[in-house]
């Protein structure tokens, strides 16, 4: 026990000790369960479901069912996959069921572990969501594990991007021995039947990516009919690669948007100007914060090129944002590191995984500025119609759990943000991998030369080598060095997940050399000798030392380095790992010490000769710890602000859902509250409002009128919420400046945000009444009434992924973005729209046409 405590920490050792009795119960049931006929398994599932449906205390009943349910899943896996859950995998499953994070090393069978709690929690008929990092893994896991669930009588759905959804097709029959051998990396699509999004969510267990779950939630809060809702609540989630999803992507909000913005000529013009500005003279770059600041000389030069006397006046302020964005695109964002150009489009590269992220776009005009820089088609800027961070989305679940190979280093954050304990699960077999100390070189060139020589040596011995790089650019550069040494190799640039899976699965073959971005092929086991295993090849590679993992650069997060190391030494196999780093690497260059460079220069060490030095290793670790702390603070800061928005978001979305489901009485109550509000202000105005409403009701008929009011409320809610999101975004950009006046930015954000939210609620009733006044009778070709002067609102939804604004500029950016003059919220609206109840021009904050094109045009300088 003391050994476990020392190895896995008190919390983990306590949990493991407490599960011993349950694991013993599951094992004791094995003989009885193995005696069951295949047809008995779905019957058992129906029996469990029946017990739960009749239970007054479902949680207790679930715990009573647990040992038998886990034993059933274990036997189903044996019969369908030829795999039996180890005892440590049962412990991992118990941790997930308890709403904790299971840290399980690579190769310990996390995908199989998830079947245990997924089956148990799906019995309650509220659904289980299993979250993966990409579409490929969602499909792969559904096909492989679908055999188990189907055997037990459960249905399985898959949600993928581009609104593609599947159900596991139990009717497809074939000899599936090959599927069990290659299913870890190759998907047999015959087992996936295309279906609707709703049907995929209605399945007992649904596989999908974190982005799709989040976007579907946002889309569900934009629908105008109950029939269009797809999600059915947030019951239990198992997050695979939980550190990647809940930590690495935590600062990146999901945004669903509609198109808006400046013409592409604007972006091209500012790109031409940015090209003529010189670094350190006209602008400065902060590499740690990935930010730029214009110098006085740069501003003067830009003003001259623009032909503007002063860009910080009311007429010129709109140029500031475009200028800063163009310079940032030029100086901070690098092709083949931050993005690639593919098929005439700028595609973002995930900084943690190296994977391409098609469909996602940077906001604030950054993406458009990069498109101008690369000479591809410039898409329009977007306006946010809804947004949420992963931090707040995943906190919707009644029970949340996760699994990964590397969670312990972030245990504090998991506990503070999500209330999740990390349980370190022992490996089934001892890890015998050798982790060598880092080799440090003076230059990147010297480092790559040394790597090429080392790989050649290992290659001649028959040792398979997996080389991890941090970017596509470094992948291709290292490939040149290996070609010079005559080493045959495969490059993985994370451009095709499925192909990537097939290649990485063979990285353990004799003499195989694979260069991959650090996270490529995550979720795929690398088996010595290849996959499927050939015994002679396995024995040869094992004798040659197993898989050698060579890291070419330290990542900002220690977890990513540990994940790369974890590719070697699975299930007690031989293996070795080592990092080759140089003083020119980004981590050392930006955060490292000048003393190291001076020391290596003083001793005259050749550039391709390494040194092993404790001081330098400590400097590396210190730099990583600094960055991790910096990112933790940034994520905490993001969450503090999003918590304010989350409270408002819940109110708006709950009210919207209520209106979707509202009956006649509830809609009548809303109309009455509008009339009452007007009467309180002015009895004559209230009477006029009542007349207008009754007049429209008579024209349309009671039923059609109330349905039109429902649509108006939904539309007005969406329009005002979009405006409110924009206003809150601008508020966020400006509150940091209030710190100079000894005021706490987050307190100011909460206070002003609440005032703006109350104004929005007040404006909603005004706008609903205003739009009711514009209702006209339907034409002969139309089935429903329409609003005068307006078409049915259309929305082009653009999936967007935006970086948060941690270090914001001045509040004038709000003006600069749209090129609008500032108008007081209580001023008459410049669009001139007349309030039919009063005969006067609407106040700006209450204007019923606030999002109409004529409204926006009238505000342009």
What does each model-identified segment do?
Residues 20, 27, 459, 628, ...:
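Short amphipathic alpha-helical segments with heptad-repeat character
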Residues 277, 539-694, 704-705, 725:
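C-terminal helicase module of SF1/SF2 nucleic-acid helicases/translocases
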Residues 160, 421-424, 612, 617-628, ...:
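Long, non-coiled-coil amphipathic alpha-helical linker/lever segments
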Residues 66-74, 96, 206, 294-296, ...:
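Core structural elements
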Residues 11-14, 61, 608-611, 615, ...:
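Non-transmembrane, amphipathic alpha-helical segments
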Residues 1-604, 654:
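Conserved P-loop NTPase motor core
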Residues 22, 29, 36, 44, ...:
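Heptad-repeat coiled-coil/leucine-zipper interface motif in alpha-helices
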Residues 626, 651, 655-861:
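Acidic/negatively charged segments and metal-coordination signatures
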């Amino acid at each position: 026990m003391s050994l476990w405590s020392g190895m896995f920490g008190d919390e983990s050792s306590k949990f493991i000790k407490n599960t011993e009795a349950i694991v013993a119960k599951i094992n004791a049931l094995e003989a009885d369960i193995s005696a069951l006929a295949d047809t008995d398994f779905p019957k058992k599932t129906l029996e469990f479901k029946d017990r739960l449906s009749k239970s007054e205390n479902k949680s207790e009943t679930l715990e009573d069912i647990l040992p038998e349910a886990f034993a059933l899943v274990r036997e189903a896996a044996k019969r369908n996959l030829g795999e039996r859950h180890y005892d440590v995998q049962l412990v991992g499953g118990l941790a997930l069921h308890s709403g904790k994070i299971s840290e399980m090393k690579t190769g310990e069978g996390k995908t199989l572990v998830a079947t245990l709690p997924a089956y148990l929690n799906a019995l309650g008929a509220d659904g289980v969501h299993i979250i993966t990092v990409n579409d490929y893994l969602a499909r792969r896991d559904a096909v492989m594990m679908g055999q188990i669930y189907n055997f037990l009588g459960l249905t399985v759905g898959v949600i993928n991007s581009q609104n593609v959804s599947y159900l596991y097709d139990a009717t497809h029959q074939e000899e599936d021995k090959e599927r069990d051998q290659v299913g870890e990396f190759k998907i047999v699509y015959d087992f996936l039947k295309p279906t609707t999004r709703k049907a995929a969510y209605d399945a007992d267990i649904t596989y999908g990516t974190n982005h799709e779950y989040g976007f579907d939630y946002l889309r569900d809060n934009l629908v105008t009919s109950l029939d269009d809702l797809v999600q059915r609540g947030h019951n239990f989630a198992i997050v695979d690669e939980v550190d990647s999803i809940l930590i690495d992507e935590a600062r990146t909000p999901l945004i669903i948007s509609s198109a808006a913005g400046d013409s592409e000529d604007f972006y091209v013009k500012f790109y031409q100007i940015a090209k003529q500005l010189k670094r350190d003279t006209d602008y400065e770059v902060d590499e740690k914060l990935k930010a730029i600041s214009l110098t006085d000389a740069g501003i003067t030069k830009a003003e001259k090129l623009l032909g503007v006397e002063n860009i910080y006046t009311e007429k010129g302020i709109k140029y500031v944002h475009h200028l800063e964005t163009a310079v940032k695109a030029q100086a901070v964002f690098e092709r083949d590191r931050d993005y690639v150009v593919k098929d005439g489009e700028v595609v973002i590269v995930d900084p943690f995984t190296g994977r391409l992220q098609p469909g996602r776009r940077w906001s604030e005009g950054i993406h458009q500025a990069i498109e101008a820089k690369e000479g591809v088609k410039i898409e329009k800027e977007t306006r946010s119609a809804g947004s949420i961070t992963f931090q707040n989305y995943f906190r919707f679940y009644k029970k949340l759990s996760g699994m990964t190979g590397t969670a312990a280093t972030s245990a504090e954050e998991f506990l503070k943000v999500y209330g999740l304990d990390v349980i370190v699960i022992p490996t089934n077999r001892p890890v015998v991998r050798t982790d060598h100390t880092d080799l440090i070189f003076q230059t990147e060139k010297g480092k790559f030369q040394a790597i090429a020589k080392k790989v050649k040596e290992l290659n001649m011995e028959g040792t398979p080598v997996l080389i991890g790089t941090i970017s596509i650019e470094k992948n291709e550069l290292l490939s040149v060095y290996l070609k010079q040494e005559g080493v045959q190799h495969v490059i993985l640039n994370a451009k095709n997940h499925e192909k990537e899976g097939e290649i990485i699965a063979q990285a353990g073959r004799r003499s195989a050399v694979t260069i991959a971005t650090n996270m490529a092929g995550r979720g795929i086991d690398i088996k010595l000798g290849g996959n499927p295993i050939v015994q002679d090849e396995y024995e040869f590679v094992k004798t040659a030392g197993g898989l050698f993992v060579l890291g070419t650069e330290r990542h900002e997060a220690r977890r990513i380095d540990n994940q790369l190391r974890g590719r070697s030494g699975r299930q007690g196999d031989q293996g070795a790992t080592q990092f080759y780093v140089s003083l020119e690497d980004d981590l050392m260059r930006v955060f490292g010490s000048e003393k190291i460079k001076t020391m290596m220069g003083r001793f005259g060490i050749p550039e391709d000769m390494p040194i092993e030095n404790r001081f330098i290793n400590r400097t590396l670790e210190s730099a990583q710890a600094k960055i991790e702390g910096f990112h933790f603070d940034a994520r905490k800061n993001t969450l503090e602000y999003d918590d304010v928005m989350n409270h408002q978001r819940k109110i708006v979305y709950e009210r919207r859902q209520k209106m979707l489901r509202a009956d006649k009485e509830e809609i009548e109550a809303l109309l009455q509250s509008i009339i009452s509000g007007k009467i309180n202000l002015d009895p004559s105005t209230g009477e006029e409002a009542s007349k207008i409403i009754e007049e429209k009701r008579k024209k349309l008929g009671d039923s059609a009128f109330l349905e039109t009011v429902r649509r108006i409320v939904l539309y007005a809610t969406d329009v005002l919420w979009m405006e409110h999101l924009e206003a809150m975004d601008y508020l966020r950009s400006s509150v940091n400046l209030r710190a100079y006046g000894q005021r706490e930015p987050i307190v100011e954000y909460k206070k002003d945000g609440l005032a703006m939210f109350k104004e929005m609620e007040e404006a909603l009733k005004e706008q609903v009444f205003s739009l009711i006044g514009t209702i006209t009778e339907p034409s002969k070709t139309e089935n429903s009434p329409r609003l005068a002067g307006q078409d049915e609102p259309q929305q082009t939804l653009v999936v967007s992924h935006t970086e948060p604004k941690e270090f914001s500029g001045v509040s004038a950016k709000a003006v600069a973005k749209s090129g609008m003059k500032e108008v007081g919220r209580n001023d008459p609206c410049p669009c001139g729209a007349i309030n039919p109840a009063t005969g006067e021009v609407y106040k700006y904050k209450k204007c019923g046409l606030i999002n109409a094109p004529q409204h926006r045009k009238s505000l342009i300088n």
